[in-house]
Amino acid sequence: MKTTTILILLTHWVHSQNPIGGKNTATLCLGHHAVANGTLVKTITDDQIEVTNATELVQSTSTGKICNNPYRVLDGRNCTLIDAMLGDPHCDVFQYGNWDLFIERSSAFSNCYPYDIPDYASLRSLVASSGTLEFMAEGFTWTGVTQNGRSSACRRGSADSFFSRLNWLTKSGNSYPTLNVTMPNNDNFDKLYIWGIHHPSTNNEQTKLYVQASGRVTVSTKRSQQTIIPNIGSRPWVRGQSGRISIYWTIVKPGDVLMINSNGNLIAPRGYFKMRTGKSSIMRSDAPIDTCVSECITPNGSIPNNKPFQNVNKVTYGKCPKYVKQSTLKLATGMRNVPERQIRGIFGAIAGFIENGWEGMIDGWYGFRYQNSEGTGQAGDLKSTQAAIDQINGKLNRVIGKTNEKFHQIEKEFSEVEGRIQDLEKYVEDTKIDLWSYNAELLVALENQHTIDLTDAEMNKLFEKTRRQLRENAEDMGNGCFKIYHKCDNACIESIRNGTYDHDIYRDEALNNRFQIRGVELKSGYKDWILWISFAISCFLICVVLLGFIMWACQKGNIRCNICI
């Protein structure tokens, strides 16, 4: 009976003094948003850390088509830019063409007299950057020769023809006099003259066309002079021809004079191309051109420029993200993610931010969970949430502003004789890409570290703000929660949340409850001790009763005990 009584009293004591379920106390926990499956990002201190949300910074795919807006994109179709400039018959449609970006197709071909350009890449780049094929004919006087030479290799319609921007000069009768022609530049812009020299396949062809056994072409300005002698000899047959034409070009500055001297083999200019300075360019691509809007174009197609980096192609035109080697770089746009644990303990799923985050928060990144005499509830804290969001919102735009190129990255081309220059250029470009790739990774890691630190700081600010409000009216439970030692209904909780809580109103009640509870408070860890003590006392009392019964029986003679030594 005594044992039973003691156990009942101890059990009643434990449950009656539990402050968590009391009507005169409340529990308030502070926490932050969490998701079941976060995103891994890299920071300065951690190679992988989970956050609630992140934004991809690397554009790794294109639209597959080239947008024709806001840039003027000219589709070269089956013509190269140089063929269009020379006036190849099948490229007549491009005469006087204008563009911001000229698209050369892999299917482009020449369909006139076979030619070569010793400095092809430079001429191609020069014309491409000019953005126009605007041509002005000039009245060159070629006395004593036959003009407008034609070839069966260059058909315009059903008739033999030639490059429309060049004039093939041959003998007149049985003579080819020495030609001396000058053409001043009296305008205020640069003029580009295209000319050439014919290399016959045989000596017989040479004398048949130009009389002399070997011709010569000299083109001069005040700044330069080029003298070219034909190389007579057979070459591989192209469109029925084993001869060749070499194309050269000369820029005449304002106030300068173009001088042409030749005694044979001259492919003369018919006029000049007006040179313009600008940011026009050329790109090799087989992507289709479509009606759409994009400020960044690559050979793979247009790409959005709303990300700071791209991994689509090194060659770009327009306002484009920086090319980097990484296929993915994630910028943290949320806080550190600590998924919510399973429901446990007498306080259910409610636990503070030190233990875990809270899933399912829809009204903020930070908030409160509480349990009082009216039940349980949850509410977000908009002020701390907005403070964190404001600092993160402009982060992506700042990164884009630091990295977007406001110019185009054109293709670099070199002739075979410039192999060492090409190798050096490739090394420089690869080094720049390596450097930018490293800088990009470092920049993102720094920004991610800052984001996580500032979101952690906002959580700590909210906790300290709450602590300062409650003062001695509550106790920090060590897990992000406060045990409030006075009756705190929903209106009281709301005053804590919005910062209007007056601790003086509840101070006396809190102190009184704290002293009463502290006298008998049993935390969950001491309940086991009470049970063990109860068990030990019960065993002791049973032993005492049993020993007393034995001694009483011995005195009455009902039990005899013999002790032998």
From Swiss-Prot:
Cytoplasmic-side positions: 551-565
Signal peptide residues on this chain, from the entry's feature table: 1-16
Membrane-side (Extracellular) residue stretches: 17-529
Disulfide bonds: C29-C481, C67-C292, C79-C91, C112-C154, C296-C320, C488-C492
Site, as annotated: Cleavage: R344, G345
Keywords for the protein's UniProt record, in alphabetical order: Clathrin- and caveolin-independent endocytosis of virus by host, Clathrin-mediated endocytosis of virus by host, Disulfide bond, Fusion of virus membrane with host endosomal membrane, Fusion of virus membrane with host membrane, Glycoprotein, Hemagglutinin, Host cell membrane, Host membrane, Host-virus interaction, Lipoprotein, Membrane, Palmitate, Signal, Transmembrane, Transmembrane helix, Viral attachment to host cell, Viral envelope protein, Viral penetration into host cytoplasm, Virion, Virus endocytosis by host, Virus entry into host cell
GO molecular function, one term: host cell surface receptor binding
S-palmitoyl cysteine lipid attachment residues: C554, C561, C564
Positions of transmembrane segments: 530-550
HAMAP family per UniProt: INFV_HEMA (MF_04072)
Note: Major glycoprotein, comprises over 80% of the envelope proteins present in virus particle.
Family: Belongs to the influenza viruses hemagglutinin family.
Complex formation: Homotrimer of disulfide-linked HA1-HA2.
The protein's name in its UniProt record: Hemagglutinin
